[in-house]
Regions:
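Hydrophobic alpha-helical segments and their helix-loop boundaries in membrane
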Residues: 1-176
Length: 176
């Protein structure tokens, strides 16, 4: 063994550990989890109960509903991986597997991200990024779709929460 061999083995392991650590964050940002947990939290506040149900229950409900919503995307991704015969045994196959899984996720994000938010992130990239990189950017790139989707979900969640609050305010006024 050469002295450089352990470092060569360490880098892919380090990349894998970092990628595994980012999976929960990515899962929250590219699913409806954020919207669901915000709506449930606002509903709890509108009811006037601060601790019932507990946050763990709200998060559990949000996870279950998010898995239900994302099931077709997951099924499509698994079918694509099976069709291509990818097992993820080496780094090249792992990269191909990520690309195969990213396509159904991209379609989901494109369907649910508002056009206004996608344009906002394209314009922001043009203002902040180097010009040659910003010109290559399209509105269906994951780097644009993920934050646009998250912002769209937040907007929808607060609109839903506002409607819930209005309903409870009307009930309070009628009862008073």
């Amino acid at each position: 063994m050469t002295p450089s061999s352990p470092a060569g083995d360490l880098i892919p392991l380090l990349v894998a550990v970092v990628a595994i650590g980012l999976v929960p964050f990515i899962a929250m940002m590219v699913t409806s989890y954020t919207k669901i947990v915000i709506v449930l939290g606002l509903l709890r506040n509108a009811l006037g109960v601060q601790q019932v149900p507990p946050n763990m229950v709200l998060n559990g409900i949000a996870i279950i509903i998010s898995v239900y919503i994302m099931a077709p995307v997951g099924m499509t991704a698994m079918d694509t991986v099976k069709e291509k015969g990818l097992a993820g045994g080496n780094v090249a196959q792992l990269g191909q597997m990520v690309e195969a899984v990213a396509e159904p996720v991209r379609e989901f994000l494109l369907k649910h991200a508002e056009h206004r938010e996608r344009n906002f992130f394209l314009k922001s990239a043009a203002a902040v990024w180097p010009q040659e990189r910003a010109k290559q950017l399209r509105d269906d790139d994951l780097i644009v779709l993920a934050p646009a989707f998250t912002l769209s979900e937040l907007s929808k969640a607060f609109r839903i929460g506002f409607l819930i609050y209005i309903a409870f305010v009307v009930v309070d006024l009628v009862v008073a």
